[in-house]
């Protein structure tokens, strides 16, 4: 999946547009809820070397928040790694060019739900 197709999926599915909150950095995009402003995704460019590859190729990566019980369900074969530059107890990194689209979409859906306003989450589960 490309960065643009990922962002398009989020715009279409969640009606959220990317935010570029970092000065002078117009490549790193944050996707957040409209009501509580919590991040559910961070898209950035990172060297493959940061994930243990012997390559300096810079690729698009998305960080997503997962419930702790889901950690270990996905692995590097799925393009899923411990989070780069975020709390590894709560976040994962997905290498967009390496991960299957269905896994990316599933995990962004999980992240979106995990970062919803708690009152809204309760209503949807009742």
What are these regions (language model features)?
Residues 1-126:
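Charge-dense, helix-prone N-terminal extensions
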């Amino acid at each position: 999946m490309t960065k643009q197709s990922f962002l398009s999926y989020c715009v279409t599915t969640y009606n959220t547009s990317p935010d570029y909150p970092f000065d002078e950095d117009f490549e790193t995009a944050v996707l957040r809820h409209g009501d509580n402003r919590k991040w559910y995704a961070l898209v950035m460019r990172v060297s493959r070397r940061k994930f243990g590859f012997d390559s300096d190729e810079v690729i698009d990566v998305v960080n997503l928040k997962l419930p702790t019980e889901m950690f270990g369900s996905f692995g590097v074969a799925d393009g899923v790694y411990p989070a780069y530059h975020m709390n590894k107890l709560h976040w994962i990194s997905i290498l967009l060019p390496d991960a299957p689209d269905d896994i990316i979409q599933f995990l962004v859906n999980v992240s979106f739900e995990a970062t919803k306003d708690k009152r809204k989450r309760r209503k949807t589960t009742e």
